[in-house]
Every structure is written in C-alpha cells, then in structure tokens.
Amino acid sequence: MADNDSLDQFLAAAIDAAKKAGQIIRKGFYETKHVEHKGQVDLVTETDKGCEELVFNHLKQLFPNHKFIGEETTAAFGVTELTDEPTWIVDPLDGTTNFVHGFPFVCVSIGLTIGKVPVVGVVYNPIMEELFTGVQGKGAFLNGKRIKVSAQSELLTALLVTEAGTKRDKATLDDTTNRINSLLTKVRSLRMSGSCALDLCGVACGRVDIFYELGFGGPWDIAAGIVIVKEAGGLIFDPSGKDLDITSQRIAASNASLKELFAEALRLTGA
C-alpha cells in the first residue's frame, strides 16, 4: 500500500487532471455536440474521447509504471483486467446523455486502485463547480470542506437515488420498473440524476440517503465514488447486502443505519 505522501501526490495529480478535463467539458457543454451511439440510448461524444486522452496523458507522464482503465478505451478495445498494480480508473464524462441535453449533472471521475482497492477518488462537475475528493484514511471533501453521509435512520423518510441504465429490452425494463414501484412504497421519494459518480457523491455529502444501481457501465463509474463515500462515513456494498465486487456492475451505498434495512427491501424485489 502507498504511504501518505504518495497518496497526497496521487490526489494532487488527479485533481489537476480533473480540472483540465473540466475545462473541455465546460466548453463543450455550451456548444453543438457531435454524438455517436454505443447502443440504443448509450451515447458518446468527442468530449468523452478528448477528456479521456487528456487525463490519461497527464497521469501517464507522472506515473508511467501505473496501469490505466478508461470507459472509452475499454469500449473500443475490450475490458482491461484489474490487477493489484496501481491502476487509474477513469470515466472522462459521466452523464454523457445529460451533457448532450444540457442538463448540468455531468462530471469527470478519476479513481486510483492499489491491490484492487480504491484509495484515491476525484469527481469534478465543472458546470456546477463542485469538486469531490477522497483519500483512504484522510476523509472526504467538497470544494475543500469535509463532508459526511446523512444521519437518516428510517427507510420511510429516506431519499433514494438510482438509475435506469441503458438497456431497453422488455425484461430489463420490467425488472427496473417493478423494483422501483416496490421501493417507492418504502422510502420518502426517488431521484435519477443520470450520473452514477455524482449519485455516490450525493450519498457522501448527505444530499441523498441511499443509492443503488444494477447494470451500470463498469468500474470507471464507481472507482472514485467508492473512496469518497467510505471516507464520508458511508458504506459501499452489493445490493444483496454482501461485499462489493468492483467489476460486477452492481452497487449500493448508504449510511450504516440504513444498509440492512435497504438491502432487505431490495431482496424482496428479487434484486
């Protein structure tokens, strides 16, 4: 495991890369977009590709021996295996559909894993000027101010956030809507922001109490947010209530009081 000085160095590099990528996102947000389809509703823009190239080039110059996993390179060349080596896991533009529509929940997400464990996380929304950071053992912050998860202890008064994903086959849609219908009877209300990384940050700073998603894109959606939630005092787990597998495309997050209550509610939906 890296020492504290190394973690601070990694964090500083990730923040620098995120802010540079943020400039590209901010510029592109207000311009006409060139949009390509990765699936029926899954989109990619030149901004996604440009940001990933910028972030990787910046970090590779500083840490040439580290490994790299990114959403767009993975989409083009296939899944890169996560090893124990220091690995930067990057979503250059989480919330691409939001970006295309001019909805300001967009961000760059940069996480670093060592021994397959996320230890540094940076999530930056350049439209709303919010920089979320977390380092293992050092706390989580929003624009430099320490954040923590909510103290909510009852499901019925909890605010839940989730996402509908990009699959539109009938079986998946039926499962998704049936699950949401069931959960809406157990929580105060439900939100969808369109960004997995920002949903995790929402749990970390107490804006929402619970997050879950089944079938998101890959580890780049969650690597940074995992650190930020944990360092804010929250729990990250598989929606079944078991330990998270970062490569499983299943995740849930909450405070300690709500974890078992929510996991049981999800189990009753068949998740």
From Swiss-Prot:
Entry comment describing in which tissues the protein is expressed: Strongly expressed in photosynthetic tissues. Expressed in pistil and seed endosperm.
E.C. numbers: 3.1.3.25, 3.1.3.93
CDD domains per record: IMPase (cd01639)
Catalytic activity: a myo-inositol phosphate + H2O = myo-inositol + phosphate; beta-L-galactose 1-phosphate + H2O = L-galactose + phosphate
UniProt pathway annotation: Polyol metabolism; myo-inositol biosynthesis; myo-inositol from D-glucose 6-phosphate: step 2/2
Top EC class for this record: hydrolase
Binding residue positions for Mg(2+) 2: D91, D94, D221
pH dependence: Optimum pH is 7.5.
Cited PROSITE patterns: IMP_1 (PS00629), IMP_2 (PS00630)
Family, per entry: Belongs to the inositol monophosphatase superfamily.
Functional description taken from the UniProt entry: Phosphatase acting on L-galactose 1-phosphate (L-Gal 1-P), D-myoinositol 3-phosphate (D-Ins 3-P) and D-myoinositol 1-phosphate (D-Ins 1-P). Can also use beta-glycerophosphate (glycerol 2-P) and, to a lesser extent, D-galactose 1-phosphate (D-Gal 1-P), alpha-D-glucose 1-phosphate (a-D-Glc 1-P), D-mannitol 1-phosphate and adenosine 2'-monophosphate as substrates. No activity with D-fructose 1-phosphate (D-Fru 1-P), fructose 1,6-bisphosphate (Fru 1,6-bisP), D-glucose 6-phosphate (D-Glc 6-P), D-alpha-glycerophosphate (glycerol 3-P), D-sorbitol 6-phosphate and D-myoinositol 2-phosphate.
Record's protein name: Inositol-phosphate phosphatase
Organism: Arabidopsis thaliana (Mouse-ear cress)
